[in-house]
A protein has these predicted regions:
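A short, well-structured edge-of-sheet supersecondary motif
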Residues: 1-10
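Conserved catalytic neighborhood of penicillin-recognizing serine enzymes
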Residues: 54-87, 171
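Solvent-exposed, polar/charged alpha-helical surfaces in well-ordered, non-transmembrane soluble domains
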Residues: 6, 29, 33, 71-75, ...
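Short, glycine/proline-biased beta-turn/loop segments that scaffold the active-site neighborhood
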Residues: 21, 37-61, 158-169
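Active-site helix/loop module of the DD-peptidase/beta-lactamase fold
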Residues: 47-64, 104-117
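Active-site SXXK
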Residues: 5, 18-46, 140
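Surface-exposed aromatic
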Residues: 15, 54-59, 87-88, 119-128
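Penicillin-recognizing serine hydrolase domain
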Residues: 96-171
């Protein structure tokens, strides 16, 4: 139950598995916490790096040097599972994806997520450490609950069924 935190049913809830794009729940949580703490604003402009533009997988095909608002980046992460935007936001907030991943793991510990270890901000499994990128259903519930209870404004992005960015231009 999201309000009380009571588990209503569980089966292998602590089995650590690769979370793939569910990783972006934590990425969005840290972005929303940065917005709420006024470290960044939804209207701030983020510039995509070469690293972000080269992420692959689900993406909106950012070009290196392309700029977009935090709001549009969040929309792209929530709606399109955009790895390029997740990486650009990580770099914008923490200076590097690696530093952002350290913050993700720290936040996971603070939330009591005992079955979780992140190695990137996207969930992509294309690097050497991908086997170490794990979480459990229980831990996903913990971070999702935190996001739902403390960052209800994110719903404006997660409830979109169709929208455009870049004036409807793709890539």
């Amino acid at each position: 139950d999201v309000t009380t935190g009571t588990v209503l049913y569980e089966n292998n809830s602590h089995e650590a598995l690769a979370p793939a794009s569910v990783t972006k729940v934590m990425t969005m949580l840290l972005i929303m916490e940065a917005v709420d703490s006024e470290k960044i604003a939804l209207t701030d402009t983020v510039t995509a790096s070469e690293n972000a533009a080269a992420k692959g997988g689900s993406q909106i095909y950012l070009k290196a040097g392309e700029t977009m608002t935090v709001s549009d980046m969040l929309k792209s992460i929530a709606v399109s599972s955009a790895n390029d935007c997740a990486c650009a936001m990580a770099e914008h907030i923490a200076g590097s994806e690696s530093a952002f991943v350290d913050a993700m793991n720290q936040r996971a510990r603070e939330l009591g997520m005992q079955d979780t270890h992140f190695v990137n901000c996207t969930g992509l499994d294309d690097d050497a450490n991908a086997r170490e990128h794990l979480t459990s259903a229980y831990d996903i519930a913990l971070m999702s609950r935190e996001l739902i209870l403390h960052h209800p404004d994110l719903r404006r992005f997660t409830t979109i069924w169709m929208d455009t960015i870049r004036g409807g231009e793709f890539g």
